[in-house]
């Protein structure tokens, strides 16, 4: 497995796009054709819990990999990676889908130091792009009235050393305030929208999530950071 923050995966995707741009017109057409054929295969694979939806999809992916994808995975140094993991910030679903198309499943995870690193993780059968997966064992979750994710469980830390005031600020009735605004799906998967402190509130009282705009901008190979 390979674990990286969103910026690592974004830079790898951009390095492929830059490399393709420097190839011959014929090679670019081959790449574009393979990506077009590979996208629905990856989408069906995601909808099927991470498994190929049919033998036809498996065979077609093998052909596309032979023609194009294997060389791209080798270029990135991930040809032997069975699964990747992405966490630490929000990430565009298009970035994750890019690697699924290449044949490297990238699973989103969520957590923080105060929750012992990981509290949510995608896994086969729970692979919705843009979601951080269901909870790990014995951890509970709920949201506050303003949408902040709250966690409770044996893996949650007890408090900050020698700082009772800081500890009191992040706990409420044994629930840890993560500082992240989320949507929780019926399946239990968490969709992290943004940091609570980064949410913009308009004069009309509407909440705007900057990360959605930032991730859309970063899908462009011409924009490094937004």
Model-derived regions, located:
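C-terminal boundary motif of the adenylate-forming
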Residues: 181, 186, 220-226
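Alpha-helix/helix-capping structural signal
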Residues: 7, 89-90, 155
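Gly/Ser/Thr-rich phosphate-binding loop
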Residues: 1-3, 12-127, 140, 223-224
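Glycine-rich phosphate/pyrophosphate-binding beta-alpha loops
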Residues: 88, 157, 210
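Conserved ATP-binding/catalytic segment of the ANL
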Residues: 135-202
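Active-site glycine-centered loops adjacent to acidic/histidine catalytic or metal-binding residues
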Residues: 88, 111, 133, 180, ...
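Amphipathic alpha-helical transducer elements in NTP-driven molecular machines
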Residues: 6-9, 27, 31, 178, ...
């Amino acid at each position: 497995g390979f674990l990286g923050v969103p910026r690592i995966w974004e830079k790898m995707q951009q390095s492929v796009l830059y490399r393709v741009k420097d190839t011959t017109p014929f090679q670019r057409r081959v790449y574009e054709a393979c990506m077009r054929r590979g996208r629905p295969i990856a989408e069906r694979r995601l909808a099927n819990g991470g498994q190929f939806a049919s033998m036809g999809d498996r065979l077609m992916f093998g052909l596309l990999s032979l023609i194009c994808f294997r060389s791209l995975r080798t270029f990135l140094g991930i040809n032997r990676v069975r699964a990747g993991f992405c966490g630490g910030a929000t990430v565009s679903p298009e970035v994750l889908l890019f690697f699924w198309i290449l044949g490297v499943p990238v699973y989103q995870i969520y957590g923080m130091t105060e929750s012992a690193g990981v509290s949510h993780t995608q896994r086969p059968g729970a692979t919705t792009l843009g979601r951080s997966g269901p909870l790990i064992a014995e951890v509970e979750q709920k949201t506050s009235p303003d949408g902040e994710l709250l966690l409770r469980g044996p893996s949650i830390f007890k408090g900050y050393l020698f700082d009772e005031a800081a500890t009191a600020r992040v706990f409420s009735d044994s629930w840890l305030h993560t500082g992240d605004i989320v949507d929780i799906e019926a399946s239990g998967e968490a969709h992290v929208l943004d940091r609570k402190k980064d949410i913009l509130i308009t004069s009309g009282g509407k909440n705007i999530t900057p990360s959605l705009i930032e991730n859309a901008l970063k899908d462009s190979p011409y924009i490094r950071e937004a």
